[in-house]
Amino acid sequence: MLEGGFILLHRSILRWEWYGDLNTARLFIHLLLTVNYEPQRWQGIAVERGQRVASLAKLADETGLTVKQVRTALEHLKRTGEVTHTATSKYG
């Protein structure tokens, strides 16, 4: 887990449409804190700045949410354009 560095979080997040949805807000902030800050490789896959490799189960474990809660929160974030999902031939 990353322990160094910081992110800037603007107060306007208080007006963000998902701010009142605790699971979605928690997952979003967790993703902001855990994405790559520089390009890296993971098992032969290029993982760029702002990206990360994770399963639903891994995100659930890291956030304390259930897999179903993570899935729902990710759907919210994908639907409104905050996150995208890229599948590879090896990983869905």
Residue ranges and their predicted role:
Residues 18, 35-92:
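Winged helix-turn-helix DNA-binding recognition segment
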